Amino acid sequence: MSSIKLIVGLANPGAEYAQTRHNAGAWYVDLLAERHNQSLKEESKFFGYTARLNLAGQDIRLLVPATFMNLSGKAVAAMASFYRILPEEILVAHDELDILPGMAKLKLGGGNGGHNGLKDIQNKLGNNPNFYRLRIGIGHPGDKSKVTGFVLGKPPASEQTLIDNAIDESIRCTEVLLNEGMTKAMNRLHAFKASA
């Protein structure tokens, strides 16, 4: 069983970004809150939108930073500091170029894969990379020069369905992570592949 006290969904703020691939982490947190009859409310001292859930018997805070993606660490560090939450008690959900739509993967620690949100969180947590990541696959445009436009673009309906299905399975696997631990959650989530 894993002790997670804070689940963060990365995003850019504002209506123009709400449906873009870069906001996949926030889609996951929003759905997680909704499934537990909660809604995120703005809390300025944490520079984001927050909610509180009881998940698998654990008291868990949800956070979607209201800052731009590359400043996500400000919100995460503020909440972690206030509630005395350690990096290894944090799960950060984010979009992942290196995973296809319809799939998601869990990992603990590691690099940031060039993801500016992860980079800033690691820096603001005292350069500590040892937090959990939920990597939600969005696919890759195939060319490095196209990445910015791709992550800030909206997926076509067929891809959106795949991403939504992977998020749905990720929510089920979050419960597995909390109840039965990382290995069981990884085994289940990594075997999942949504079909169109």
From Swiss-Prot:
Where along the chain is the active site annotated?
H22 (proton acceptor)
Keywords from the named record: Cytoplasm, Hydrolase, RNA-binding, tRNA-binding
Q: Which residues bind tRNA?
A: Y17, F68, N70, N116
- Give any single GO term for biological process: protein quality control for misfolded or incompletely synthesized proteins
For this chain, the family text in UniProt reads:
Belongs to the PTH family.
> What is this enzyme's catalytic activity, as reactions?
an N-acyl-L-alpha-aminoacyl-tRNA + H2O = an N-acyl-L-amino acid + a tRNA + H(+)
What does the record note on quaternary structure?
Monomer.
Protein name, UniProt field: Peptidyl-tRNA hydrolase
EC number(s) given by UniProt: 3.1.1.29
Q: What function does the entry list?
A: Hydrolyzes ribosome-free peptidyl-tRNAs (with 1 or more amino acids incorporated), which drop off the ribosome during protein synthesis, or as a result of ribosome stalling.
Q: Where in the cell is it found?
A: Cytoplasm
| Species of the source | Yersinia pseudotuberculosis serotype O:1b (strain IP 31758)
Do you know which InterPro entries this protein is assigned to? Pept_tRNA_hydro (IPR001328), Pept_tRNA_hydro_CS (IPR018171), Pept_tRNA_hydro_sf (IPR036416)
**Which residue positions does UniProt flag as site: Stabilizes the basic form of H active site to accept a proton?**
D95
Q: Where is this site: Discriminates between blocked and unblocked aminoacyl-tRNA?
A: N12
Pfam families the UniProt entry points to = Pept_tRNA_hydro
